[in-house]
Amino acid sequence: MTDLLNDRLPPQNIEAEQAVLGAIFLQPSALTLASEVLIPDDFYRMSHQKIYNAMLVLGDRGEPVDLVTVTSELANTDLLEEVGGISYLTDIANSVPTAANIEYYAKIVEEKSILRRLIRTATTIAQDGYTREDEVEDLLSEAEKTIMEVAQRKNTSAFQNIKDVLVQTYDNIEQLHNRKGDITGIPTGFTELDRMTAGFQRNDLIIVAARPSVGKTAFALNIAQNVATKTDESVAIFSLEMGAEQLVMRMLCAEGNINAQNLRTGNLTEEDWGKLTMAMGSLSNSGIYIDDTPGIRVSEIRAKCRRLKQESGLGMILIDYLQLIQGSGRSKDNRQQEVSEISRELKSIARELQVPVIALSQLSRGVEQRQDKRPMMSDIRESGSIEQDADIVAFLYRDDYYDKETENKNIIEIIIAKQRNGPVGTVSLAFVKEYNKFVNLERRFDDAGVPPGA
């Protein structure tokens, strides 16, 4: 395959490259347009790379960019003869009658450059497949990363005129005004939480943090179930701590109001079997997709969610939990930097796929040393930039976790410590431990299946 590639001329368009350089000679202000799109390496011909680089150097110094100054700059760096001398520069300067089409020519040069990068990347991936002895997962992750770098170069966005943004913003406001209710995002199913957040917004990274055994996994799973069973949105769940079967057992308990211990032991009554059948039917019709790969890389999460969105649609991503995700390995000697890199990538995934990403997080033991055990931002374990990247940071706190004699048994506080586009505050829910289920406080005794002492 390498021989086949070596026999073929890589994608390039010399005329377009000359047109870009000629347009800059003709109208130096065209350099600004070109520099927003092209870097020297985008030019196929080496001489064009050096000429364009000289133009950029002059532009950065605030000096005029014309035939005389570019010739002088190349001569001063002993590159004039390498690029073809003054005669070739003159030919380029005379090659285009107008600079009006520079953006069109620059786009051609950029696209040819992307194709060459893609070919080089694919060739490297193929060679690594034959020669490297790394774990297959490492090769896949690295291959995906390099392909993504090529794709991201293509997808860089330009400035948007505020007039265009205002039109889109007005349309969105009008849609919000015309819709019923105050929920503008994806409803969690918890009334007071939805009232405070207006639902979880697309593009948002939501961090849910708590000490072990407080109920953060149950809380997140309840949200996932509510979304998947009560809306037409699909939910991707990445469980790095528990297997898929354990998660499904928990979801069956919550969906069917089945005692968790009875389900674990198989000690089910006839009524329980009926509830189980109902719960299985409800969950099987929901769009819940579970990946229980331990130690999954953030690049794998991105790739799998991309594929899922293309094939089945995607409305929400849930990750349990953030500190178990592997980063790229670039910051392997500094775990805090690696976790910061992961949180930035998760925010990037939320924006790219336009879905809320809920990432559970551990809290440090520092919270145990204070008299008031309610968590604070500084308690997020290996926090790094987590609190900066997150749009919402929610802490879970249960008084009976620390005080067994408290009157607030099975009441959990959802402390919204940060909300980028909304208020902060506290929402209280009831936790029905037997069912691994959270319910709105006003519903606490509504369901006959929920014991009064819950």
Swiss-Prot record:
It comes from the Bacteria. SUPFAM superfamilies: N-terminal domain of DnaB helicase (SSF48024), P-loop containing nucleoside triphosphate hydrolases (SSF52540). Keywords: ATP-binding, Cytoplasm, DNA replication, DNA-binding, Helicase, Hydrolase, Isomerase, Nucleotide-binding, Primosome. This is Replicative DNA helicase DnaC. The gene is dnaC. Pfam families: DnaB, DnaB_C. The lineage of its organism: Bacteria, Bacillati, Bacillota, Bacilli, Bacillales. Disruption phenotype: Essential, it cannot be deleted; in depletion experiments DNA replication stops as soon as the protein is degraded. It comes from Bacillus subtilis (strain 168). CDD domains: DnaB_C. Its EC number is 5.6.2.3. It is found in: Cytoplasm, Nucleoid. The main replicative DNA helicase, it participates in initiation and elongation during chromosome replication. Travels ahead of the DNA replisome, separating dsDNA into templates for DNA synthesis. The monomer has helicase activity in the presence of DnaI which is further increased by DnaB; the purified oligomeric form (probably a DnaC hexamer) does not have helicase activity in vitro, nor does the DnaC(6):DnaI(6) complex. The direction was not determined but is probably 5'-3'. Helicase activity requires an rNTP and is inactive with dNTPs. Deletion of a single T residue in the promoter region (a run of 8 Ts becomes 7 Ts) decreases the helicase levels by 50%, decreasing DNA replication inititation during fast growth in rich medium. Suppresses the synthetic lethality of a dnaA1-yabA deletion for growth on rich medium.
